[in-house]
A protein has these predicted regions:
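Small-molecule-sensing regulatory modules
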Residues: 1-42, 67-80, 84-91, 99-283
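Short, structured active-site "lid" loops
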Residues: 42-63
């Protein structure tokens, strides 16, 4: 039996639960409890504050955890970062009052910086030869300059809207983060086998993101050119049609390239193009 720790609430909770659901692990309604079992996979889900997850996994109370890489780096716990998950993206940046002139990291020499991430900030300042003091606070870091608590802040930035509304501007991107799957370093053989199954499912879900399945009819005379246009997984699937001189072509493309590919295919005679959403791709 595995035990996986995820965030109690918020966007990362929702995305973690959605990932589990996408890979066939149903935890519907489970966040009303502190600990719950999945009905269809040998796993328990433990709901915690995000900053507690690395320590709980390192100590072995949970086998696995889904948490931001920023929390892993800040807590410094000895865990295995198994894989990036492709969601929960953010950055931790230095920001200063909008009216201030910024000339580079030397700006922070002798300044006081408010943050909830003193370890990551300390490492950055040391690497850049900057001596600054810190005001370590939890929550509402962005109000610190206006409240006279600090000269600048070091905090999570997603869209930047919160900074703007508090009269701040981002001047240094220090740490890029996203959700990661972490594991205790001393998993049993049984736990490791279950983790491998989870990873297989996660990879199948991940490779299907941003993909579309194309089906079309195309003149046989244009087939070689169409194959060059379409990357597919290995090569496109080609099937003859009852109508002489025509075939059916199936392929997978990135969503970002879809309309460009369709334009090229139409130009060489493709007809009846169907675009389907992919649920899973099994590697």
């Amino acid at each position: 039996m595995l035990r996986i720790a995820i965030q109690t609430k918020g966007r990362l909770n929702e995305q973690s639960v959605e990932l589990l659901r996408e890979i066939g692990i149903d935890v519907e309604g489970a966040k009303r409890k502190f600990l719950s079992k999945a009905a269809n996979f040998p796993i328990e889900v433990l709901y915690l504050r995000d900053d507690d997850i690395p320590q709980v996994v390192a100590e072995g109370t949970a086998s696995l955890g889904i948490v931001g890489m920023n929390e892993v780096a800040e807590r410094g716990c000895d865990v295995e970062v198994v894989t990036k998950l492709g969601f929960g993206g953010c950055r931790i940046s230095l920001a200063i009052p909008k009216a201030e002139e910024y000339s580079g990291v030397e700006y922070f020499q002798g300044k006081k910086i408010a943050t909830s991430y003193p370890e990551i900030l300390s490492k950055f300042l040391k690497e850049n030869g900057v001596e600054a003091s810190m005001a370590v606070i939890t929550g509402s870091v962005e109000i610190a300059p206006a409240a006279g608590i600090a000269d600048a802040i070091f905090d999570i930035v997603s869209s930047g809207g919160t900074l703007v509304s508090n009269g701040l501007k981002e001047v240094e991107r220090v740490f890029e983060s996203e959700a990661v799957l972490i594991a205790n370093r001393n998993l049993s053989a049984e736990e490791r086998e279950l983790l491998d199954e989870l990873l297989f499912r996660i990879e199948s879900e991940r490779v299907s993101r941003g993909k579309k399945y194309l089906l079309m009819n195309i003149p046989t005379s244009s087939l070689d050119e169409a194959v060059k246009i379409l990357p597919a997984m290995r090569s496109p699937t080609v099937m003859p049609l009852a109508a002489e001189g025509w075939c059916s072509l199936h392929s997978v493309v990135d969503s970002a390239d879809l309309w460009d590919k369709v334009r090229q295919l139409k130009a060489i005679g493709a007809e009846g193009i169907l675009v389907l959403t992919l649920d899973k791709i099994i590697p």
